[in-house]
Amino acid sequence: RDKNGNVVNYNGNIQTCPNGAYQKEKSLEILREVLTTHPFDGVFCNMSGFLVVDYSGVYHGPCHCENCKRLFREQYGLEIPQKDDPGNLDYKKYASFKSACTKKYRERLVKTIREINPELAINNLDYIRTESATEIGVAQWQYSASSNARKTAGPLRERPADNASVDFMGFRYRDTSVSAPQLALRQWQNLANAGSVSLYIMGHLGNHQDRTALTASKPAFDFH
């Protein structure tokens, strides 16, 4: 919640924090359900943690939910800062608080997954995930996939590297794919630098209207 206690609602998507029931309890219940009913190879949890902006870049500030306020007050005897200000001494304590909360949640997440299946790959533990993407107003690097895969795999090409080719043009254009040559180039760069073929789309394969990414990426997936 924001400093006024309002829920952060972005077009029906509610932002949560690691100290709320959804991330602490429900997310693990959902994870346990899907991992015991479907044959997954690995897990990547996207955008968990303490988010302060929404997809449109609107700043909402630190979470002021009752759990966060209570825990921070118990540990530091302070109120949560109104805004993110690294120059504020209280904010530095809040940053430490967030780091500790995130670490605890991560430990519970890993424990849950390992109990279900020790062979499941977990992001940032068993493999490293990066992205090759475009965004409005951001300079483009045509060899992004090569750089990411090579950096992650290491000089001996021993570390599992998952560099996801992002289908969409930018968060404000999430339903429109970048060009087919761009998408194909990323996948072949991944393979040439000891990475895996990896595609990131919004939604799921069955209802994805712009099929450009699927068609362009298929030859690399077939080859791999």
Regions found by a protein language model. Give the residues of each.
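Active-site-adjacent "subsite" loops/lids of carbohydrate-active enzymes
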Residues: 1-38, 47, 68-99, 107
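Aromatic-lined carbohydrate-binding/catalytic grooves of carbohydrate-active enzymes
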Residues: 1-11, 52-68, 119, 125-128
